Amino acid sequence: MGLRARDIVLSTVAAESLLRLEQSPDPASRSIARRVRSLRSILLADCLHGEVVKKDRIPKALKDKHGLENLFVEDLPSFWRLLYTIVRDRGERYIVVVEIADHRVYDRWSPGRSR
């Protein structure tokens, strides 16, 4: 049994990305959106499911934009990534999805760490 979270919240940026993916006529985009939706139950049951990004490796741009103290990454179809953080409020854990990004955007945040 994993570390449970009370709820998942999408940042404005992540919500806009998900909406664009869901409304796209491209089947690959809809596949990415379906995977994001299917991760909900997995992440609620185990908020540590994603790959941990070490504190010193959290991209400064994301740290500054979202005020991150921790960051986790879930791989999505077509080399997209779902980036989330875990926050606590009144003793409860919440997952905040900060970004849903394609590999070009993700690689820009982490220069020098290409595949």
Q: What kind of feature is each model-predicted range?
A:
Residues 1-80, 87-115:
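Basic, Lys/Arg-enriched alpha-helical interface segments
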